[in-house]
Amino acid sequence: MNILITGATGYVGRRVVKQLIENDKNISILTINRDINKAQSILPFSNCKHVSVNDMEKEVLLFSPNICIHLATLSTSRNDDEIINPMIEANITFGVKLLATLFKVDSLQLFINTGSFAEYRNGVENGFNDAYLYTATKSAYRHFVDYYSQLKGFKYINAVPFTIYGGDDTAKKLMDYMMESINAKEPVKMSPGNQILDFVHVDDVVRFYVSAVNSINNISLLPNGSNYYLGTGIGTRVKDLATLIESKIHKRLNIFWGGLNYRPLDVMYAVAPTEDNNQVIPWKTQISLDQGIDKLIKKYDIYEN
């Protein structure tokens, strides 16, 4: 099977590539990159070819992918003038060029698009209501995916990750700031902490993409454009998360609650409606929040004294 992956060197992407190769030594992977040297360093696998975005059309046509996993994105809460052009380029222009290239191949069966829970600021049941400029570009991009899907006839699904944590991402997550606050000299400023979020471990998110690849023979049974909500289905208040961490390490987190204001359109409740996920792709989380925090404590080497 030939799999095309964008964003392969990212937080989720690098884990997806490694897991796919671990599961199937005969798989062939093509990654599209802005920095080939970085890709070769992070993913030095013989059955994984890394090519430049400038050579995308030529290389994709030669590769003839069966599946495309689209993870590349510019994710930020910024909406200032300087971020607009790079965000449109990364989240829309590049993605549309990718689709235009895939239109020229006859092998593609499935396109896995990746969205964000913050596209649904007022809940999935209320449809799109973007919290950030970033998520507005993600919502807009879906229309392009749907257009090319209908034009060419390939199937597509939308993976919608909720609040991902865990692993060794260079971009710090909420839990990382919490853990680092323990030894901080000054309190770490955070919002009032009343958001209720669905914390999903990165390893569980990776399992979804692998499961989708393994389900390729049943993809015809899926309604086109199906959403898969990648979360546990359980919400936890941010302040309660801090309390849970404190109960495990028997130390206080040095946090100044309310030191930062909520963002203008902040998401106050985001829990994955996992019951809506079509079981054609048989996926559910395996790592509870309790287990995930234990992994994080081990990562930071923080134990009760």
Where are these regions (language model features)?
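C-terminal "lid/loop" region of Rossmann-like NAD(P)-dependent oxidoreductases
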Residues: 31, 225-228, 237-242, 250-269
